[in-house]
């Protein structure tokens, strides 16, 4: 079986919903990343077999294909857009790696993009062509209509209740995320991930959601979103805009082209869970991944779990017995933000730049009751 390696990874800084990036469509968010890869790796770009991107609330029309054409890549390069909800970006990386393992191609661009600010409004279509009532807008995607179809916030509350994750634990974890993120912005770790872009004449190179100086006591002042609950705006991620791209190729080819370091994809797992508890998806996903590769949690140096809600990450940490020295050691989405279709690819990008780590996992809890996880080693 061929081996797939990630040899380059970059992302935009993540903008807040309605923030600096609010006027940019998904393909426009991706354009500077594609252009960066074109300029830095011209010999490789000419050999691309496919572009695979995750996206959840975009404007349709196969964003991967639209974006590569907008960026000026050859029209002979195909593109495919994947929707596995929040896990789409990680799924795109696994898809590309598996295609290489199977011998279907040797060079792929994978990643993800989301503009929550530019997400189209959706209107329910009437059953009758003669309908005269005012149109009804969809408030959100329906994740599991045949079940109780909880919102993501209700799902986080369900997880918090089942796994006894208190409000205090959730606020403590959120504070940790902001502190670690701020530290790793200051020391330059996170800046390695980010490609500065010019937006309306200004350089944009810092995640807008980060609150580096928020006092710890402030987290307890926020009211629960659901009456009587524990999930608040402070211990949940924000809605965000942003894009991520990774260059993935067959290992021998990477060496031939002069790439000397990166991530080796070892394996990936996607599972289903009760849709009422979507945030717990990383637990069986990571457990299955470890079992399949004859590893234990202690064998993994870094585990990146997307921080949609403090409740779900704390529950996963407790269920898997993950130490603080392993989990989200540069902070996470509670501070940096969660552009849905890009977030999984961002986790892998973060692992890419942890040059002193050897064995790593990225994992996502996914709306509708899913979880995915991928195992990487350094090459």
From Swiss-Prot:
EC number: 2.3.1.-
Keywords: Acyltransferase, Transferase
Gene Ontology molecular function: any one: acetyl-CoA C-acyltransferase activity
Biological process (GO), any one: phenylacetate catabolic process
Keyword Transferase: yes
A Gene Ontology cellular-component term: cytoplasm
Pfam families (UniProt xref): Thiolase_C, Thiolase_N
Gene3D superfamilies: 3.40.47.10
Domain of life of the source: Bacteria
Active site, UniProt feature: 86, 338
Classification via NCBIfam families: AcCoA-C-Actrans
Similarity annotation: Belongs to the thiolase-like superfamily. Thiolase family.
Protein name: Putative acetyl-CoA C-acetyltransferase VraB
Protein species of origin: Staphylococcus aureus (strain COL)
Recorded name of the encoding gene: vraB
């Amino acid at each position: 079986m061929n081996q797939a390696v990630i040899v380059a990874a970059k992302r935009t800084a993540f903008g807040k919903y309605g923030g600096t990036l609010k006027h940019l469509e998904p393909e426009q968010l991706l354009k500077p990343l594609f252009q960066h890869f074109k300029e830095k790796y011209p010999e490789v770009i000419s050999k691309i077999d496919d572009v695979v991107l995750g996206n959840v609330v975009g404007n349709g029309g196969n964003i991967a294909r639209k974006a590569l054409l907008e960026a000026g890549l050859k029209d002979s390069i195909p593109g495919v857009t994947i929707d596995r909800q929040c896990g789409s970006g990680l799924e795109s990386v696994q898809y590309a790696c598996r295609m290489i393992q199977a011998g279907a191609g040797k060079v792929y661009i994978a990643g993800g993009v989301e503009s929550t600010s530019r997400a189209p409004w959706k209107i329910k279509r009437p059953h009758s062509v003669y309908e005269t009532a005012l149109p009804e807008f969809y408030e959100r995607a329906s994740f599991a209509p045949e079940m109780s179809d909880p919102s993501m916030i209700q799902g986080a509350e369900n997880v918090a209740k089942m796994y006894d994750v208190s409000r205090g634990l959730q606020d403590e974890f959120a504070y940790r995320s902001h502190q670690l993120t701020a530290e790793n912005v200051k020391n330059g770790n996170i800046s390695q991930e980010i490609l500065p872009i010019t937006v309306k004449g200004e350089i944009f190179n810092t995640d807008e959601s980060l609150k580096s100086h928020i006092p710890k006591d402030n987290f307890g002042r926020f009211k629960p979103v659901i009456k009587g609950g524990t999930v608040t705006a402070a211990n949940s991620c924000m809605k965000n805009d942003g894009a991520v791209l990774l260059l993935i190729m067959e290992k021998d080819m990477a060496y031939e082209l002069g790439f000397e370091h990166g991530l080796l994809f070892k394996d990936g797992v996607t599972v289903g869970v009760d849709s009422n508890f979507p945030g717990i998806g990383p637990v069986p996903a990571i457990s299955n991944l470890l079992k399949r590769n004859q590893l234990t949690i202690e064998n993994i140096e870094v585990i990146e779990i997307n921080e949609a809600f403090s409740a779900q990450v704390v529950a996963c940490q407790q269920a898997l017995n993950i130490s603080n020295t392993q989990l989200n050691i540069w902070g996470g989405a509670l501070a940096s933000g969660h552009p849905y279709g890009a977030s999984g690819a961002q986790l892998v990008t973060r692992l890419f730049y942890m040059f002193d780590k050897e064995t790593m996992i990225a994992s996502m809890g996914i709306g509708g009751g899913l979880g995915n996880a991928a195992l990487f080693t350094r090459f």
